[in-house]
């Protein structure tokens, strides 16, 4: 005779446990939204800065469009993502206050504080770009765009490994990421200069024929 399989209902969770899971779920959602906004925002800064190299009226049209996109992204997506992330983190600590005694959490909060500074600095850069006061080049913004990647890696590793974080492996990983990012930025800059030189030569050749 085959054994009968009985369906059993899951045991009800306590209110604090349920609250913890809800806070954690929305904390993760907030992180995804926040980082997506930060990555795209600084990418828009790159395009905004590079628009200065375009002839009129394309230059003015592009800069106004990027300014509008930056404001909407920062105010509607990035900042709400940051608020949800921080608010849900506070909720997690409220449901599990003993976690404040963990050394890894203090380090993680330090990197989160750096990320918050980065967030508000991006807001300041956005205003300078809108006012035409930013002196940053597209290549410099590309470098700035890589900063949250490093912070994200460290924060996630701390959240996963906690006090067992392998420092040697983490250090080498960060060094490798920095080298790879710097190399990609330099390669793109070289390609862009080569493309611009080729375009200039083609324009000169076309003018000579006319």
Curated annotation (Swiss-Prot):
EC number: 1.3.99.-
GO biological process, one term: protoporphyrinogen IX biosynthetic process
Knockout mutant characteristics: Attempts to disrupt this gene in the wild-type background of Synechocystis only allow to obtain heteroplasmic disruptants. These cells accumulate a substantial amount of protoporphyrin IX.
Needed cofactors: heme b
Major subcellular site: membrane
Main enzyme class: oxidoreductase
Name of the molecule in the record: Protoporphyrinogen IX oxidase
Species the sequence originates in: Synechocystis sp. (strain ATCC 27184 / PCC 6803 / Kazusa)
